[in-house]
Amino acid sequence: AMDNIAENKGQAYFAKTADEARRIVGELVGSKKSIVKAKSLTCEEIDLRQHLQELGNEVWETDLGELILQLLDESPMHILSPSIHVPKEDVAELFSKVMHKEVPTDIASEVAAARDFLRKRYVDADIGISGANIASADTGSLFVIENEGNARLSTGLPPVHIAVVGIEKLVPTLGESFKVA
């Protein structure tokens, strides 16, 4: 897989521990960078956002639930709906404060406010970070499946994309990737 990623003009690294993964990504990123990050359980497990922030980077979660939690400085409460415990009234108040504009207390307005807030961050980002649902060893291909559009923007707009992928996501062939994804 690593050779095939290199053949596609990418770089691949193997980390045995969370500390090693954070170190590798930290060395690739450096400091004083603007980063947009798509939801990734692997990145969450290794506390990547916090590590990159400690290195002096500005890191923005782009998943709506993760963004809410980042702004509240809270941890996820659920794997699929990380901010399910936060009432929409609290989200409207939070967004109004952070975004310096009145955000109505309805979900559609809150989503629109988050989209507007993140748009500039996508465009200005130096680096986009994501996970991947599946990685194909024979082609070096990554499958990133999403439902909000944030992963597409996080991986496609910044000039650099870093994917943090656990070994359990690696399958031997592209054909098998389609079956598993």
Question: Where are the language model's segments positioned?
Answer:
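The feature marks the mature, well-folded catalytic cores of soluble enzymes
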Residues: 1-181
